[in-house]
């Protein structure tokens, strides 16, 4: 159904148009995408004729600032936060609406000597400002176009146009596939672009390393920053990591209520302590503490989920009532930290099959699952049973 990201990059570099689809639970739409620097009048005309949507130009924050392209509105109420700037035409255009003149405006935007006074406002070209971090921060067509331009080694700007069917309704994936086949276009997804970037780019920075004596033993604490979202994570390392030998590893998601306050609603605190004890006894291992509170939904939303649980919902139902998946955690950043530490093979302390799959998917080998089941109590028994029944956690009752 979909093509490889590498194939799409090659086509874009040749000046061709591709189709980029987003997720079904987002806009569930496809856009024509091209490099801005290769947006000839023919490319623009193709998008207008067969896309039928609004032709926009995703650019960086730096370019928007340089050309004084202010936001179209002061208060953006769009559900997806699409960052339109004021629309523009190049100063030497006439009406600015033809494919030729829109192409002229786009090329003028990319001129390194361009200045704010070169453009009339409003106009017929609609710049969109991509978030820093690209699709890793916002999974939109705006960010995808700029990311793809960068991956092509081109100027970081694109041209996009929503694809609408002849009857005026939005083209969905099956329709988009037919269009791609008709015009021999590559078709990719933003989801695949996200995974491609996570595989190819280093997204963590090692910041500091100190010795940390604890009640469980002495560990080396190594702090990391996610360079995309700024979140800070820490690895507690015991002994020497030998890449070719399996390392005992626990990837533990932050749980303030359980880890710090000793909440009985979950088993997080006891799991954290048990993992540290086992690593200390082993004499070599890693506990990776990830800032993914509440299975990724954050502290306040976790407390909201607790409120719903008090009304009879289980932990999965509560997340879904709040509009979140049952488990929003991502293991790509954790995998990059483990690789930075020299871990390639691991004995993973977990009951969660998704964690095993997630880490394997980022090139790490899980040679053994080491169970980490804690005794249930009257406060968390339903929670644990729900994880067993609905999330597939490997638990025994």
Curated annotation (Swiss-Prot):
Region entry DHBP synthase, spans: 1-199
Residues annotated to bind Mg(2+) 2: 27, 141
Reaction(s) catalysed by this chain's protein: D-ribulose 5-phosphate = (2S)-2-hydroxy-3-oxobutyl phosphate + formate + H(+); GTP + 4 H2O = 2,5-diamino-6-hydroxy-4-(5-phosphoribosylamino)-pyrimidine + formate + 2 phosphate + 3 H(+)
EC number from the UniProt entry: 4.1.99.12, 3.5.4.25
Keyword flag Flavoprotein: no
Cofactor needs: Mg(2+); Mn(2+); Zn(2+)
Pfam families in alphabetical order: DHBP_synthase, GTP_cyclohydro2
Cofactor binding remark: Binds 2 divalent metal cations per subunit. Magnesium or manganese. Binds 1 zinc ion per subunit.
GO terms of molecular function: 3,4-dihydroxy-2-butanone-4-phosphate synthase activity; GTP binding; GTP cyclohydrolase II activity; magnesium ion binding; manganese ion binding; zinc ion binding
Residues involved in D-ribulose 5-phosphate binding: 26-27, 31, 138-142, 162
Entry GO CC: cytosol
Residues binding GTP, per UniProt: 250-254, 271, 293-295, 315, 350, 355
UniProt xrefs under InterPro entries: DHBP_synth_RibB-like_a/b_dom, DHBP_synthase_RibB, GTP_cyclohydro_II, RibA, RibA-like_sf, Riboflavin_synth_RibBA
UniProt KW keywords: GTP-binding, Hydrolase, Lyase, Magnesium, Manganese, Metal-binding, Multifunctional enzyme, Nucleotide-binding, Riboflavin biosynthesis, Zinc
CDD domains in UniProt: GTP_cyclohydro2
Site feature Essential for DHBP synthase activity, where: 124, 162
Recorded family membership: In the N-terminal section; belongs to the DHBP synthase family.
UniProt-annotated binding residues for Zn(2+): 255, 266, 268
Annotated active site: 327 (proton acceptor), 329 (nucleophile)
GO terms of biological process kind: riboflavin biosynthetic process
Annotated segments matching region GTP cyclohydrolase II: 200-397
Stated role: Catalyzes the conversion of D-ribulose 5-phosphate to formate and 3,4-dihydroxy-2-butanone 4-phosphate. Catalyzes the conversion of GTP to 2,5-diamino-6-ribosylamino-4(3H)-pyrimidinone 5'-phosphate (DARP), formate and pyrophosphate.
Full protein name: Riboflavin biosynthesis protein RibBA
Residues engaged in binding Mg(2+) 1: 27
Pathway: Cofactor biosynthesis; riboflavin biosynthesis; 2-hydroxy-3-oxobutyl phosphate from D-ribulose 5-phosphate: step 1/1; Cofactor biosynthesis; riboflavin biosynthesis; 5-amino-6-(D-ribitylamino)uracil from GTP: step 1/4
HAMAP family registered for this protein in UniProt: RibA (MF_00179), RibB (MF_00180), RibBA (MF_01283)
